[in-house]
Amino acid sequence: MVMQTMLRVLTVSLAFALTSYALPAAADEFEVTIHHVELQDPGLKAKVGDAISFVNHADISHNLYLTYEDGQVETLDTQPPRTTKRTVLKRAGHVVVRCWIHPIIRMEFDVAAK
């Protein structure tokens, strides 16, 4: 009798734990295409943890970097033609994407908290 009661309590506890456990939201993947000296802005609705891939379809190299609202800079290093660079968004707030080589290239978007 005691064993059955303990088993019921354990079963109910386990069921409650499994149903109340929330899985983290899956991260989204975005792709931004570089055409010569222009970034195709796909209208990002990004959040912290999402990934962005920058695909260089230009015939020239680029060197993109992201500047977060708090001043933190993340550089993606030199990106030769027909290559892809990927980054995961680390902070919420306003982000500006620019190219060290071609300062005319610019894209802005906001990153929401998780």
Swiss-Prot record:
Gene3D superfamilies linked: Cupredoxins - blue copper proteins (2.60.40.420)
Q: Which SUPFAM superfamilies match?
A: Cupredoxins (SSF49503)
- InterPro entries per the record? Cupredoxin, MauL
Q: In which pathway does it act?
A: One-carbon metabolism; methylamine degradation
Record's function text = Probably involved in TTQ prosthetic group biosynthesis.
Which protein, by its recorded name, is this?
Answer: Methylamine utilization protein MauL
Could you tell me which species this protein originates from? Methylorubrum extorquens (strain ATCC 14718 / DSM 1338 / JCM 2805 / NCIMB 9133 / AM1)
The protein's gene is named mauL
